[in-house]
Amino acid sequence: MATTRKDTTPDRVREETHEVVVIGAGMAGLMAATTLADRDVVVLEASDRAGGRVDTVRKGDYWINVGTQFTEGTGPLIDALHRHRVHLGTLEGKSVALSLGGKQVDTSNPFALMFRSKMTWGDRLGLAAVGTRILANVPFLEMSPDNRWANRVRAKLDNRRADFVLRGVRSELAREMVRSWSGQWMGCEPEETAATQFVFSMGILLTDPEKVDNLTLPEGGNQTLTDILAADLGDRVRLGSPVHTVEWTEDGVVVDYEDAAGPARIRARRAIVAVPADIAVKIMPGLPPDHRTAFEAIHYGRYVVVGFFTHEEGPQRWDDFLAVSTPGLSFQAVFNHAAALRRGVRKPGGALACFAGGAEADRLFELGDEEIVARFTADLLRLYPELEGKVEPGILRRHPRVVPFWAPGGRATLATLREPLGPVHLAGDYLLDMPSLADAAASGQQAAERVLASLGAR
């Protein structure tokens, strides 16, 4: 059982003792704490809400994910959704489109993309070169990691920049499209990231979403699950409790944090640190050099998101697309959160999220909220004039840190972070294969299972 010592002396720090302290209440932290629910566990979260980059706004029959867009993958995330009976809206039959020159073309149809969109022959040749370089590598990324050829290709991609797909491409349109795709799916520029993650995202998500396991939109949005997990944990999740330091010895950890009542300290046998890489470096000053180097190799995509609830009636030209790429606009993509609901008779209304990532997000960060929303609203109506008078005020989110990625060669340091630091275990979507919500959940559960094994039976 937890023990608490209260001390009202101003110069003294309140102290508690627990078996396990989890730092961070994003998907990884919540899944870790859920796995440890039968033990004496407490979760410290700096912000005023649980869920981390999972953020959903709801209204009536619709919802908008203004953080992480989709749920996909296998493992603990999908298991938890099924266990809690969260309905998963299928995206089967939905695809990604490109809006260009007033036309909307399905990107999974190469012929239509090349010849039905308004491109010059130079643009078509440039895009063909880009597509060939991406698709030639995708099959190797889909193979088992035990495959020798797959490992060779992955190693090569890990050590080259993603903008290799633009080598020799003179078409400004093709170059703009690649930057737009990189921004919308990864939140970075192609020259910032190693090619592996870029090729995977572009080659599978963009051209054939049905290849992605369990690509779904959970009913009520991605936040439905994090809300359930946080509610089940109850007051063991402490919001508004930023951690200042995590220190450890072979025998346990000491976590200094602050809450509304002032400075506080938790002593625990084990800790799970489930925060972004830069925060981990900040709160763990005693990191060994190799761990610090590995954390510093992790970069994050950044986004500006504006969500719009809409009031249209009848079938619309975006209904069959889960996303529409929009090069040339203030946002790079529109994600259609009502896509999974478009079965049978179409209900009135809708839910769209407009995204800008990478360098475009950096520029938007310099603007005020009203200016960003005004630009996105104007461009949404430019894209879909039929929505004039049917769009509610935009819901803005600024995300300076979302999808983890690595520069060429940077991912080689990741193995270091997969080993515990004595009683401190790490969790996060950066630890597994391709960063995703599913990887965050799996990482949290795996960290908790290692903690349980180290604690032994009660």
Q: Where do the model's predicted regions map?
A:
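Conserved flavin/dinucleotide-binding core of flavoenzymes
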Residues: 2-15, 31, 252, 318-458
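N-terminal Rossmann-like FAD-binding beta1-loop-alpha1 element of flavoenzymes
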Residues: 19-43
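A short alpha-helix-loop-beta-strand transition element characteristic
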Residues: 78-100, 172-179, 297-300, 315-318
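Active-site/ligand-binding neighborhood in enzyme catalytic cores
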Residues: 139-253
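Mid-domain catalytic core of redox enzymes
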Residues: 14-15, 239-352, 359-365, 382-383
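Glycine-rich FAD pyrophosphate-binding loop
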Residues: 37-59
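Dinucleotide-binding Rossmann-like beta1-alpha1 core, especially the glycine-rich loop
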Residues: 61-140, 151
